[in-house]
Amino acid sequence: MTNLNYQQTHFVMSAPDIRHLPSDTGIEVAFAGRSNAGKSSALNTLTNQKSLARTSKTPGRTQLINLFEVADGKRLVDLPGYGYAEVPEEMKRKWQRALGEYLEKRQSLQGLVVLMDIRHPLKDLDQQMIEWAVDSNIAVLVLLTKTDKLASGARKAQLNMVREAVLAFNGDVQVETFSSLKKQGVDKLRQKLDTWFSEMQPVEETQDGE
């Protein structure tokens, strides 16, 4: 298994939908989560870069699909945050369409990291993301974020509860805890990404360039 240097991750581009993404080759691992789940902070912690992914004081600001390259043909994808109450309904529907289309049609997408605030896990849209991934045979890592907000006993109870709940999806779904503030869980995230990038088959360029 190759240990990648995530500190070398760099921004490639932003796209409003799947049609504006670069060619569907290599391996992509996407990060998804509700608007306040700590997704940008997790990406910045993983790469040890303070502003690789912009953290916004206004949840729901990230409306684009953001691509980052870790190494040649190996990309991380920051998907639009979902579920923020103050975003207009039409925009919510647009985001959900873009998310669904990306998850269903992007061949190079081979792993999905779903981030959830450990205090409020498995909301409807979180479950929908996991269902989409499992239905598309995409491996899932659930990261329960902001673990520093709970005492040790409550953390373990939440972790066990979510691990039990995801069994119902009947897919490749692993659950771990994560804290950007305490740098807890970063090693497990890196190990999972290394495994995915090393063991999964990259998508090759086709003759017609599709």
UniProtKB/Swiss-Prot annotation:
Mg(2+) binds at residues 40, 62. SUPFAM superfamilies: P-loop containing nucleoside triphosphate hydrolases. Its cofactor is Mg(2+). One of its GO terms (cellular component) is cytosol. CDD domains: YihA_EngB. GO terms for molecular function: GTP binding; metal ion binding. InterPro entries: G_ENGB_dom, GTP-bd, GTP-bd_ribosome_bio_YsxC, P-loop_NTPase. Keywords: Cell cycle, Cell division, GTP-binding, Magnesium, Metal-binding, Nucleotide-binding, Septation. Pfam families: MMR_HSR1. Belongs to the TRAFAC class TrmE-Era-EngA-EngB-Septin-like GTPase superfamily. EngB GTPase family. This is Probable GTP-binding protein EngB. It comes from Escherichia coli O6:K15:H31 (strain 536 / UPEC). The gene is engB.
